[in-house]
Amino acid sequence: MISLKNFGLLFWKRFSENKLNQVAGALTYSTMLAIVPLVMVIFSIFSAFPVFNEVTGELKEMIFTNFAPSASDMVGEYIDQFVSNSKKMSAVGIVSLIAVALMLINNIDRTLNSIWHNSQSRSPLSSFAIYWMILTLGPLIIGVSIGISSYIKIMFEQSEHLSLGLKLLSFVPFLFTWFIFTLIYTVVPNKKVKIKHSAYGAFLAAIFFTLGKQAFTWYVVTFPSYQLIYGAMATLPIMLLWIQISWLVVLVGAQLASTLDEIGEQIEQ
Protein backbone atom coordinates (compact mmCIF):
# COMPACT_ATOMS: atom_id res chain seq x y z
CA MET A 1 0.00 0.00 0.00
CA ILE A 2 1.54 3.31 -1.07
CA SER A 3 1.75 6.11 1.49
CA LEU A 4 0.04 9.46 0.98
CA LYS A 5 3.46 11.15 0.77
CA ASN A 6 4.69 8.81 -1.97
CA PHE A 7 1.40 9.21 -3.82
CA GLY A 8 1.76 12.99 -3.68
CA LEU A 9 5.35 12.80 -4.94
CA LEU A 10 4.33 10.53 -7.82
CA PHE A 11 1.42 12.80 -8.70
CA TRP A 12 3.67 15.88 -8.76
CA LYS A 13 6.31 14.03 -10.79
CA ARG A 14 3.77 13.05 -13.44
CA PHE A 15 2.25 16.55 -13.37
CA SER A 16 5.69 18.07 -14.08
CA GLU A 17 6.62 15.47 -16.71
CA ASN A 18 3.40 16.11 -18.61
CA LYS A 19 3.96 19.91 -18.40
CA LEU A 20 0.30 20.45 -17.62
CA ASN A 21 0.70 24.19 -17.05
CA GLN A 22 1.91 24.62 -20.64
CA VAL A 23 -0.71 22.19 -21.93
CA ALA A 24 -3.47 24.22 -20.25
CA GLY A 25 -2.17 27.31 -22.06
CA ALA A 26 -2.21 25.50 -25.42
CA LEU A 27 -5.77 24.26 -24.83
CA THR A 28 -6.81 27.80 -23.89
CA TYR A 29 -5.59 29.05 -27.27
CA SER A 30 -7.41 26.21 -29.05
CA THR A 31 -10.58 26.95 -27.08
CA MET A 32 -10.55 30.63 -28.02
CA LEU A 33 -10.34 29.64 -31.69
CA ALA A 34 -13.06 26.99 -31.38
CA ILE A 35 -15.53 28.61 -28.98
CA VAL A 36 -17.61 30.32 -31.67
CA PRO A 37 -17.78 27.21 -33.92
CA LEU A 38 -18.70 25.06 -30.91
CA VAL A 39 -21.47 27.42 -29.79
CA MET A 40 -22.71 27.72 -33.37
CA VAL A 41 -22.96 23.93 -33.74
CA ILE A 42 -24.61 23.52 -30.32
CA PHE A 43 -27.35 26.09 -30.93
CA SER A 44 -27.87 24.95 -34.52
CA ILE A 45 -28.60 21.46 -33.17
CA PHE A 46 -30.93 22.94 -30.56
CA SER A 47 -32.82 24.96 -33.17
CA ALA A 48 -33.52 21.73 -35.09
CA PHE A 49 -35.46 20.37 -32.09
CA PRO A 50 -38.33 22.70 -31.03
CA VAL A 51 -38.67 20.77 -27.76
CA PHE A 52 -35.42 22.42 -26.59
CA ASN A 53 -36.61 26.01 -27.21
CA GLU A 54 -37.51 26.48 -23.55
CA VAL A 55 -34.10 25.40 -22.25
CA THR A 56 -31.96 27.31 -24.77
CA GLY A 57 -31.83 30.36 -22.50
CA GLU A 58 -30.67 28.25 -19.55
CA LEU A 59 -28.03 26.58 -21.71
CA LYS A 60 -26.73 29.98 -22.82
CA GLU A 61 -26.53 31.12 -19.22
CA MET A 62 -24.64 27.95 -18.24
CA ILE A 63 -22.13 28.29 -21.10
CA PHE A 64 -21.50 31.99 -20.61
CA THR A 65 -21.23 31.71 -16.83
CA ASN A 66 -18.73 28.85 -17.02
CA PHE A 67 -16.57 30.51 -19.67
CA ALA A 68 -16.46 33.95 -18.04
CA PRO A 69 -18.14 34.07 -14.60
CA SER A 70 -17.55 37.81 -14.11
CA ALA A 71 -18.39 38.95 -17.64
CA SER A 72 -21.09 36.54 -18.76
CA ASP A 73 -23.46 39.26 -20.05
CA MET A 74 -20.87 40.85 -22.33
CA VAL A 75 -19.54 37.49 -23.51
CA GLY A 76 -23.11 36.40 -24.18
CA GLU A 77 -23.72 39.46 -26.38
CA TYR A 78 -20.52 38.85 -28.35
CA ILE A 79 -21.23 35.16 -28.92
CA ASP A 80 -24.86 35.86 -29.89
CA GLN A 81 -23.52 38.28 -32.48
CA PHE A 82 -20.94 35.78 -33.76
CA VAL A 83 -23.54 33.02 -34.04
CA SER A 84 -25.91 35.38 -35.85
CA ASN A 85 -23.16 36.28 -38.33
CA SER A 86 -22.33 32.61 -38.88
CA LYS A 87 -25.83 32.04 -40.28
CA LYS A 88 -24.85 34.18 -43.26
CA MET A 89 -21.82 32.02 -44.05
CA SER A 90 -21.45 29.77 -47.07
CA ALA A 91 -21.32 25.98 -46.85
CA VAL A 92 -17.52 26.08 -47.10
CA GLY A 93 -17.34 28.50 -44.17
CA ILE A 94 -19.64 26.34 -42.05
CA VAL A 95 -17.56 23.23 -42.80
CA SER A 96 -14.44 25.18 -41.79
CA LEU A 97 -16.00 26.17 -38.46
CA ILE A 98 -17.03 22.57 -37.77
CA ALA A 99 -13.48 21.46 -38.61
CA VAL A 100 -12.09 23.92 -36.04
CA ALA A 101 -14.48 22.55 -33.40
CA LEU A 102 -13.42 18.98 -34.22
CA MET A 103 -9.75 20.02 -33.95
CA LEU A 104 -10.37 21.18 -30.37
CA ILE A 105 -11.93 17.82 -29.50
CA ASN A 106 -8.93 16.12 -31.12
CA ASN A 107 -6.53 18.22 -29.00
CA ILE A 108 -8.42 17.25 -25.84
CA ASP A 109 -8.32 13.58 -26.88
CA ARG A 110 -4.56 13.61 -27.52
CA THR A 111 -3.88 15.53 -24.30
CA LEU A 112 -5.78 13.11 -22.05
CA ASN A 113 -4.23 10.09 -23.75
CA SER A 114 -0.77 11.56 -23.19
CA ILE A 115 -1.58 11.94 -19.47
CA TRP A 116 -2.37 8.21 -19.39
CA HIS A 117 0.85 7.58 -21.38
CA ASN A 118 -1.18 5.81 -24.02
CA SER A 119 0.69 5.65 -27.33
CA GLN A 120 -1.92 3.46 -29.03
CA SER A 121 -4.01 5.72 -31.25
CA ARG A 122 -7.43 5.10 -32.76
CA SER A 123 -7.93 4.79 -36.48
CA PRO A 124 -8.81 8.08 -38.26
CA LEU A 125 -12.30 6.80 -39.09
CA SER A 126 -12.94 5.71 -35.51
CA SER A 127 -11.64 9.02 -34.15
CA PHE A 128 -13.83 11.04 -36.52
CA ALA A 129 -16.91 8.99 -35.59
CA ILE A 130 -16.29 9.56 -31.87
CA TYR A 131 -15.59 13.29 -32.29
CA TRP A 132 -18.68 13.74 -34.44
CA MET A 133 -20.81 11.87 -31.89
CA ILE A 134 -19.50 14.14 -29.11
CA LEU A 135 -20.19 17.24 -31.20
CA THR A 136 -23.74 16.22 -32.12
CA LEU A 137 -25.01 14.09 -29.22
CA GLY A 138 -23.28 16.12 -26.49
CA PRO A 139 -25.59 19.15 -26.85
CA LEU A 140 -28.66 16.90 -26.90
CA ILE A 141 -27.62 15.17 -23.67
CA ILE A 142 -26.98 18.55 -22.03
CA GLY A 143 -30.34 19.84 -23.28
CA VAL A 144 -32.22 16.84 -21.89
CA SER A 145 -30.41 17.22 -18.54
CA ILE A 146 -31.30 20.92 -18.30
CA GLY A 147 -34.89 20.18 -19.27
CA ILE A 148 -35.25 17.51 -16.58
CA SER A 149 -33.65 19.79 -13.96
CA SER A 150 -36.01 22.63 -14.89
CA TYR A 151 -39.03 20.34 -14.67
CA ILE A 152 -38.01 19.03 -11.24
CA LYS A 153 -37.31 22.57 -10.02
CA ILE A 154 -40.77 23.76 -11.10
CA MET A 155 -42.35 20.74 -9.41
CA PHE A 156 -40.56 21.53 -6.13
CA GLU A 157 -41.42 25.24 -6.33
CA GLN A 158 -45.12 24.48 -6.76
CA SER A 159 -45.20 22.29 -3.66
CA GLU A 160 -45.09 23.78 -0.17
CA HIS A 161 -43.88 20.50 1.34
CA LEU A 162 -40.79 20.00 -0.80
CA SER A 163 -38.59 22.89 0.36
CA LEU A 164 -35.85 20.43 1.37
CA GLY A 165 -35.88 19.02 -2.14
CA LEU A 166 -35.46 22.53 -3.55
CA LYS A 167 -32.40 23.03 -1.36
CA LEU A 168 -30.96 19.70 -2.47
CA LEU A 169 -31.55 20.78 -6.06
CA SER A 170 -28.88 23.46 -5.60
CA PHE A 171 -26.32 20.62 -5.68
CA VAL A 172 -27.41 19.53 -9.16
CA PRO A 173 -24.86 21.76 -11.01
CA PHE A 174 -22.03 20.25 -8.94
CA LEU A 175 -23.29 16.69 -9.47
CA PHE A 176 -23.69 17.33 -13.19
CA THR A 177 -20.11 18.69 -13.37
CA TRP A 178 -18.85 15.63 -11.48
CA PHE A 179 -20.72 13.32 -13.85
CA ILE A 180 -19.36 15.04 -16.98
CA PHE A 181 -15.76 14.92 -15.71
CA THR A 182 -16.16 11.25 -14.75
CA LEU A 183 -17.50 10.47 -18.21
CA ILE A 184 -14.61 12.32 -19.90
CA TYR A 185 -11.91 10.61 -17.81
CA THR A 186 -13.48 7.19 -18.41
CA VAL A 187 -14.35 7.37 -22.11
CA VAL A 188 -11.72 9.61 -23.75
CA PRO A 189 -8.51 7.69 -22.87
CA ASN A 190 -7.96 4.89 -25.39
CA LYS A 191 -7.46 2.33 -22.63
CA LYS A 192 -9.48 0.79 -19.82
CA VAL A 193 -9.80 3.24 -16.93
CA LYS A 194 -11.38 2.11 -13.67
CA ILE A 195 -14.50 4.16 -13.13
CA LYS A 196 -13.76 4.64 -9.42
CA HIS A 197 -10.44 6.27 -10.33
CA SER A 198 -12.20 8.47 -12.88
CA ALA A 199 -14.78 9.39 -10.24
CA TYR A 200 -12.09 10.35 -7.70
CA GLY A 201 -10.31 12.56 -10.22
CA ALA A 202 -13.61 14.02 -11.40
CA PHE A 203 -14.71 14.75 -7.82
CA LEU A 204 -11.52 16.74 -7.18
CA ALA A 205 -11.91 18.58 -10.49
CA ALA A 206 -15.58 19.35 -9.78
CA ILE A 207 -14.71 20.79 -6.35
CA PHE A 208 -11.87 22.91 -7.76
CA PHE A 209 -14.05 24.04 -10.68
CA THR A 210 -16.99 25.05 -8.47
CA LEU A 211 -14.89 26.80 -5.82
CA GLY A 212 -12.59 28.30 -8.46
CA LYS A 213 -15.52 29.85 -10.30
CA GLN A 214 -16.76 31.50 -7.11
CA ALA A 215 -13.27 32.65 -6.07
CA PHE A 216 -12.50 33.99 -9.56
CA THR A 217 -15.75 35.97 -9.68
CA TRP A 218 -15.06 37.39 -6.21
CA TYR A 219 -11.51 38.39 -7.15
CA VAL A 220 -12.48 40.13 -10.39
CA VAL A 221 -15.34 42.01 -8.73
CA THR A 222 -13.35 42.93 -5.60
CA PHE A 223 -10.07 43.84 -7.33
CA PRO A 224 -11.09 45.30 -10.71
CA SER A 225 -7.52 45.92 -11.89
CA TYR A 226 -8.22 44.37 -15.29
CA GLN A 227 -11.01 46.86 -15.96
CA LEU A 228 -8.75 49.75 -14.94
CA ILE A 229 -5.87 48.61 -17.17
CA TYR A 230 -7.70 47.24 -20.23
CA GLY A 231 -10.89 49.30 -20.12
CA ALA A 232 -13.47 48.10 -22.64
CA MET A 233 -11.21 45.19 -23.67
CA ALA A 234 -11.05 43.76 -20.13
CA THR A 235 -13.38 40.90 -21.07
CA LEU A 236 -10.73 39.24 -23.26
CA PRO A 237 -7.94 38.76 -20.66
CA ILE A 238 -10.53 37.85 -18.01
CA MET A 239 -11.97 35.18 -20.29
CA LEU A 240 -8.51 33.89 -21.23
CA LEU A 241 -7.48 33.62 -17.59
CA TRP A 242 -10.64 31.77 -16.57
CA ILE A 243 -10.44 29.32 -19.49
CA GLN A 244 -6.81 28.54 -18.58
CA ILE A 245 -7.77 27.97 -14.94
CA SER A 246 -10.63 25.72 -16.06
CA TRP A 247 -8.36 23.62 -18.26
CA LEU A 248 -5.79 23.34 -15.49
CA VAL A 249 -8.52 22.02 -13.18
CA VAL A 250 -9.60 19.46 -15.82
CA LEU A 251 -6.00 18.31 -16.31
CA VAL A 252 -5.33 18.05 -12.55
CA GLY A 253 -8.38 15.78 -12.20
CA ALA A 254 -7.21 13.69 -15.14
CA GLN A 255 -3.71 13.41 -13.67
CA LEU A 256 -5.15 12.23 -10.35
CA ALA A 257 -7.21 9.54 -12.10
CA SER A 258 -4.18 8.50 -14.18
CA THR A 259 -1.93 8.31 -11.12
CA LEU A 260 -4.48 6.15 -9.29
CA ASP A 261 -4.62 3.88 -12.35
CA GLU A 262 -0.82 3.64 -12.44
CA ILE A 263 -0.59 2.71 -8.76
CA GLY A 264 -3.41 0.19 -9.16
CA GLU A 265 -1.55 -1.50 -12.03
CA GLN A 266 1.66 -1.64 -9.96
CA ILE A 267 -0.17 -3.27 -7.04
CA GLU A 268 -1.81 -5.86 -9.32
CA GLN A 269 1.59 -6.80 -10.74
UniProtKB/Swiss-Prot annotation:
Entries under PANTHER family matching the protein: INNER MEMBRANE PROTEIN YHJD, UPF0761 MEMBRANE PROTEIN YIHY
Statement: the UniProt record of this protein carries the keyword Translocase: no
Keywords of this entry: Cell inner membrane, Cell membrane, Membrane, Transmembrane, Transmembrane helix
Species: Haemophilus influenzae (strain 86-028NP)
One Pfam match: Virul_fac_BrkB
Subcellular location: Cell inner membrane
Membrane topology: Multi-pass membrane protein
Family from the record: Belongs to the UPF0761 family.
Transmembrane domains' residue ranges: 32-52, 89-109, 128-148, 168-188, 203-223, 232-252
Cell inner membrane found in the keyword field: yes
Name of this protein: UPF0761 membrane protein NTHI0384
Chief place of localization: membrane
GO CC annotation, single: plasma membrane
